[in-house]
Amino acid sequence: MIKYVLISALLVVAVYSFTIEDNEDALLEEAEDELDTEEERRMALPPGAVCNGHKSDCQCFGAKYKCSCPLLWRFRRSAKCHCKKGWAWTAIKKRSCHNRYQWSG
């Protein structure tokens, strides 16, 4: 019985430690995103330009343009993402972009 209690306690501690690490990683990503928003505010990429697939669609100029990447682009070095026209929901998603003043009329 005591073995089960100890094993359960160790399992809870292990899960808790992984959760704390995930929270720290999330905080670091949020800090990096805040720095990236300053760059996004300054410049939006024109349609057809090469964009960073790891960042948001806000980097592409226009309400309906998104950063579109080819299939399995993360595993191919030569694959590049480009700003391409998306669907109507892309415009809805991009309403929260910090640089929307550049393309909104």
From Swiss-Prot:
InterPro entries: Toxin_34
Endpoints of the signal sequence: 1-17
GO-annotated cellular components: extracellular region
Propeptide residue range(s): 18-41
UniProt keyword list: Disulfide bond, Ion channel impairing toxin, Neurotoxin, Potassium channel impairing toxin, Secreted, Signal, Toxin, Voltage-gated potassium channel impairing toxin
A single MF term (Gene Ontology): toxin activity
Pfam family name, one: Toxin_34
The protein's name: U2-lycotoxin-Ls1a
Compartment list: Secreted
Family (UniProt): Belongs to the neurotoxin 04 (omega-agtx) family. 01 (type I omega-agtx) subfamily.
Disulphide bridges, residue numbers: C51-C67, C58-C97, C60-C83, C69-C81
UniProt keyword annotation of Signal present: yes
Organs and tissues of expression: Expressed by the venom gland.
Function: Insecticidal to house crickets. It induces an excitatory slow-onset impact that leads to irreversible spastic paralysis. It also modifies human voltage-gated potassium channel Kv1.5/KCNA5. Most likely, it binds to the voltage-sensing domain of the channel, suggesting it does not block the pore but prevents its opening at physiological membrane potentials. The recombinant peptide binds to the channel in an irreversible manner and slows down the hKv1.5 current activation kinetics. It is not toxic to mice, when intracranially injected (at 0.5 ug/g mouse).
